[in-house]
Amino acid sequence: MSSLDVHPAPSHRLYRAYARFGFLPTVLVILVVALALFVPRFLTVQNIFNVLRSSAYLVILSAGQMTVLIVGGFDLSVGAVVPLASVVSALVMVWAKGVAPDQTAIIVLLGVLAGIGSGLAVGLINGLSVAFLKVSPFIVTLGSLSIATGVALLLTNGIPVYGMPQAYVNGFGRGLWLQLPTAVYLAALIVALVWFIQNFTRMGRYLYAIGGNLQAATVSGVRTRTYLVLAYLFCSVLAAVSGLALTAQIGSGQAVISAQLTLESIAAAVIAGVSLKGGVGRVEMVTLAAFFLLILTDAMDLLKIDPRIQTIFLGCIVVLAVALDEVAKRRASVD
């Protein structure tokens, strides 16, 4: 070996790894170990199942939000697409059950397609408005949020929709496979799909290119409008899938599921290091961030911390995450 060979110091290698992956994996491990040691109820089977199931819904939702953020967009409507898909799918299943009560597979299929279709409709409105009409993503998705919320409430009058096939509720929503909730496998499948798109497809490369520099991508021949629409469609479809999974778990269509879904999906993306300016974001980090948020929330629930304080604390965590990642990126660029 030549004396001129230069090897980076271990500390530099560790720092570059930190700059690439951020603080999240370390903090997540520390949090889990601390909870296991000091909060005995955290390791109960029921609590672990609840965390895994809740994390799965947020992972699916956040993967879609990340896709829109990568192209430099923003989607406030995901929190309304979830209940919209919930009530639409439930209403269609109840209707189909009355028409053909013995055709469970067809009943479920029609409901699922209707729920996903509602997500596609919202995503199409958002995508076309942003890509072709040049409407601000914030404004158009805020409008879609209001529309989707209003439609869901109008369809149900705020009353839960019961009567879905028990095979759908017990088999998919509350079922276990290899001792894990089925929602976990659904989330894992979607994460694998998004990871594949990001790393091995033309669409993945183009989405990053659009978020990095829209004008340069256009000059390079990328059909930027088409891929912008696809990004918003993909985001809304994943929100609808999350809504379908939640509906199956709850056992009814709900027009009001959670007021914080949009905030949580954005928080997971930001904590994961997804750039709000576009062009940066990895689905594996978003998955870890979703787990981090749900474990943190679960810990505060177990410790009986006031929900109002929880909201403040989570907001502080988001701000701190953005600050730490920004410092790490600046130091990495200097080195």
Label every PLM stretch briefly:
Residues 33-38, 43-97, 101, 128-135, ...:
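Single transmembrane alpha-helix segments in multi-pass membrane proteins
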Residues 98-145, 288-292:
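Alpha-helical transmembrane segments within multi-pass membrane transporters and channels
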Residues 107-115, 121-126, 179-254, 265:
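Helix-loop-helix "hairpin" substructures at the membrane interface of multi-pass membrane proteins
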